[in-house]
Every structure is written in C-alpha cells, then in structure tokens.
Amino acid sequence: MSLIELDHLEKSYGMVPALTDLTLAVPEGCLYGFLGPNGAGKTTTLRILATLLSPDSGRVIVAGVDALENPRQVRQILGYVAQEVAIDKILTGRELLALQGDLYHLPRTERNQRIDDLIQRLSMQEWIDRRCGTYSGGMRRRLDLAAGLLHSPRLLVLDEPTVGLDLESRAVIWDVLQDLRDQGTTILLSSHYLEEVDALAERMAIIDAGRVIAEGTPEELKCALGGDRVTLRVREFSDQVEAETIRDLLDAVEGVRRIVINRAQGHSLNLVVDGDHVLPRIQKRLGDNDLRVFSLAQSRPSLDDVYLQATGRTLMDAELAVAGQRDPKQERRQSMR
C-alpha cells in the first residue's frame, strides 16, 4: 500500500518549468530514495508534499488524505527537514526542542522523554545545552533532524540531510535513518549522493528536469542495464575533439554497446561492454591507430550508470551544467514563494 501518491504534478516558476508530469508512489514503511542533480526538481517536489508549496496542477495524496484540500491533517503525521537549516541562535538546542514540542502540544513529561531519547540517539549530549549559534554545520543538521522527529511522525521527509556534513555526522544520521526504517517509519530521502541512496534506500526514483526517469530498487535498476562498465583514458586529460575521435573508433568494436564522453572527468570515455573478452578488442583497435591506453578500469553497473543510460550524461555532468546556469537571486526568490 502506498503512503504517498503524487499524480501528474506540474509546477513552474514564471516561465521556467520545475516539475513536468511528475508521478510517484511511495510504499508505507519504506525508506525511499529520491536521487537527482541540483535543479532537477527534488526540493520543489518535497515542498509540495510538505504542504509548503502548491503545484500548478496534479494531486497529492498522503495516507489517503488529499494534501491540497486538507493540509492541516497531513501536517499532523509528517516531519519535514528542509535543506536549509533554520534555528534560533540564541536558544540552546534543548530549549529549541522544548519549544518545538510545545508547538506540537506534547505533554511536558512526554516531550522531555522524547527530547532525552533523541539527544541520545543523535549523539548530542556534549553540546545540546550550548547556544545554537556556536554549533557546527553537522551539529545544526542533527538538531534539525531531532526537531523533525520530536512528534514521532508517520512520514519523514528529508531534503539533502547530509549535504556538506563531516563523516561523523553523516554516519550518525545514517544510523538513525536505518533504525527508523526498521521501526516502520516511511522516509522520503532526497539526495544527490549516489552512495547514500544506494546504501540506504529500499526503493528509489531518479529525477531529471522535473520528471521521474527511472524507478525501482537500486539493485533492480542496476541489473536492468546489463553488461560491464569500462572507464577508459588514452591520456590523463583529453580534449573534446580527441575524445570524440576515440569514441568513433571504438563504436564499431564488437561487444561495445554504448560510449559516453565524461567531460567532468577529463573527457574520459565511459563504455558499456558485453564482458572481459571485449577489452583486448578495444586495446587492439587503439593500438592499430597508434593510441595507447593510459588507464582502464572495469566495474559492475552503478546508479550513476543508470542515470547515464537514461539521460546521456553522468550525475556530475548534470551538476556542472546546472551550476553554470544558476541565478542565486532567482533561487532565493523561488524558495520564498
């Protein structure tokens, strides 16, 4: 049974489309990964789900409730942790959690018990009674997660919860999310970290340019690709012209299914091949054209390969493309709507 149903969502900011016919179903009790580059529409989707933003069209159903018609009812079962941490720098972490508990009308004894439990689970004992203005980014993120969990939500929505964090804070958050998943909490986790979604998610969707382009378990998506992945270089850094020349040479090699130029990695070539037996053919074709292999690495399919198969570019290439198009002022205006 699906706890979340997003049907044909459309959303634009002025003339710029953010979501285009986005449809998604998240099973109850599942840790569901939402993977895509910055600017793909992840935050817009989560803000609509959290009843903080209205779509131009489409339906949002949470636990059988129409979130657009009854947002108050949905908010009672939902915990939302936004990408941008917003905390009062004057309060201590404990005081902020107490305030959050009061806003949820939790009885004082229950509120304090939950606060103590979250302090323990998120390893905040050493600094929880210091003012929030003294906290590091990892401390603030853990506190923000604790605030989102204080009312024991049935559904937890997380927007890039570990972006920019130190390894210790990331490990703590991963452990908590795995425990919540085991206890039956439904979690929608937005991320552009491939390894995070691969490690944590039971099911996932990949989003690009406001559309869901792939959906399933991480293993299903990787296995569906078939073949081995080969990363090839003829020198440490090639240019676009040389990379295209090599691609054209290798396209005709028997057993080579697909070749994509990875601009973000010095114009290396990402190949999909039928197996080990194809590698000598690749090396021979290069040698016949007076080209030597600088480096060659073979691996099984990854989530980046899934993204590459669906879009023709790697996730890092997509990140770089978005970074070059960004308008910080426009992004701030959009986030305030």
Located regions from the model:
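Short phosphate-engaging motifs
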Residues: 18, 196, 239-242, 278, ...
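Solvent-exposed beta-strand sheet faces enriched in polar/charged residues
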Residues: 7, 233, 262, 297-299
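ABC transporter nucleotide-binding domain
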Residues: 175-273
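C-terminal coupling/interaction segments
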Residues: 274-337
